[in-house]
């Protein structure tokens, strides 16, 4: 019986290092997903649903018809929820000025980091999903 290949659906060196430290054999394949295209779904899905939807979209982008791999994909959504205002997604700032502005917006407030993880069996289409939410101040 041929062992199943675990595919880490990520371009993150940090996620790859985690699996390496665990001694888990895997191959890394970056998914082709425009994460920002999903921003408008925050109100409908909430942070937890959005994180899972992004992780699943990454797995679906890597799935091959007739494949037999296990696809491990994840996404983290940062969100600032202020009473009386719609939730605000926190993206990677991109510039030093944007970083300062984001840090100022977070100062003295609690924000959430929500992780969605999907393990998709390419052969059956079955998926296991996990969501973790951490509140940070």
List the predicted regions and their residue ranges.
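Anionic-ligand binding patches
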Residues: 2-6, 20, 44-137
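N-terminal G-site helix/loop of the GST-like fold
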Residues: 5-30
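Short alpha-helical interface patches
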Residues: 17, 36-37, 101
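Short glycine-rich, Thr/Ser-proximal phosphate-binding strand/loop in the N-terminal lobe
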Residues: 23-45, 128-133
């Amino acid at each position: 019986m041929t062992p199943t290949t675990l595919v880490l659906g990520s371009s993150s060196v940090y996620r790859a290092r985690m699996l390496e430290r665990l001694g888990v054999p895997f191959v890394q394949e970056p998914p082709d997903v425009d994460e920002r295209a999903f921003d408008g779904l925050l109100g409908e899905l909430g942070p937890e649903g959005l994180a899972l939807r992004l992780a699943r979209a990454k797995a679906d982008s890597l799935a091959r018809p007739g494949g037999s791999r296990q696809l491990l994909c994840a996404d983290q959504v940062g969100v600032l929820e202020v009473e009386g205002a719609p939730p605000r997604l926190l993206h990677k700032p991109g510039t030093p000025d944007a970083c300062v502005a984001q840090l100022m917006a977070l100062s003295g407030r609690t924000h959430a980091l929500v992780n969605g993880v999907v393990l998709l069996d390419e052969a059956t289409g079955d998926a296991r999903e996990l969501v973790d939410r951490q509140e940070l101040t």
